[in-house]
Amino acid sequence: MAQVMISQHPLVQHKLTLLRRATTEPKKFRELVRELSQFLLYEATLDLPLQERIVDTPLAPYHGHRIAERVGLVPILRAGLGMVDPILDLIPTAHVWHLGLYRDHATLKPVTYYNKLPPEVDVDLCLVLDPMLATGGSAVAAVTVLKEWGASRIKFLGLIAAPEGVQALHQEHPDVPIHLAAIDDCLNDHGYIVPGLGDAGDRLFGTG
């Protein structure tokens, strides 16, 4: 799939291995999510358009550039929250809107319980953030909500995916690029990615 990009950066693969360890404590887990999110953001924004900007250095004017597009971050609650701050560190002007989607454990289907999108679209690029792309239901639902809202350019950023989730998102929204650190083997009977890393939300926030 041309729209699925898996980072092969050695640091990404090194840190992803540390993230997966069952013995990694929540504090270290959050730090690793932060670092991996920034690596993925770097790769996902390589095509951001630029416009010329002139600034004064201590010696002379300099003809430089600035990002031409307005960026919006859409973390899927709650695990997506762990990816917001590291991205804001690099794009401090980004807008942040929250979508609350939980997976019904009986049907494995997403249920929307929170939506804080403004009345009108005021960004050029939306980045949907969720560390885990498992069944793909939440990601598909989030992108659908954004398109119905009027967003025209959307990308998905996640750390680990199952083939089923990638297929579901790509099939429903083939125009949405998917940026990942890894695609794992499969989903188990409970809808968890295998080998995965467990429940990302629980590990981020020390619950479960």
Curated annotation (Swiss-Prot):
Cofactor(s) it depends on: Mg(2+)
Pathway participation: Pyrimidine metabolism; UMP biosynthesis via salvage pathway; UMP from uracil: step 1/1
Catalytic activity entry: UMP + diphosphate = 5-phospho-alpha-D-ribose 1-diphosphate + uracil
Residue sites binding uracil per the record: I193, G198, D199, A200
UniProt cofactor note: Binds 1 Mg(2+) ion per subunit. The magnesium is bound as Mg-PRPP.
A GO MF label: magnesium ion binding
Protein origin, superkingdom: Bacteria
Glycosyltransferase found in the keyword field: yes
Positions with a binding annotation for 5-phospho-alpha-D-ribose 1-diphosphate: R78, R103, D130, P131, M132, L133, A134, T135, G136, G137, S138, D199
Residue ranges that the Swiss-Prot or TrEMBL entry lists as coiled coil: none
Keywords recorded for this protein, A-Z: Allosteric enzyme, Glycosyltransferase, GTP-binding, Magnesium, Nucleotide-binding, Transferase
EC assignment: 2.4.2.9
GO BP annotations listed: UMP salvage; uracil salvage
Short name of one Pfam family: UPRTase
Keyword Repeat listed: no
Activity regulation remarks: Allosterically activated by GTP.
Recorded family membership: Belongs to the UPRTase family.
Role played: Catalyzes the conversion of uracil and 5-phospho-alpha-D-ribose 1-diphosphate (PRPP) to UMP and diphosphate.
Name of the protein: Uracil phosphoribosyltransferase
Origin species: Roseiflexus sp. (strain RS-1)
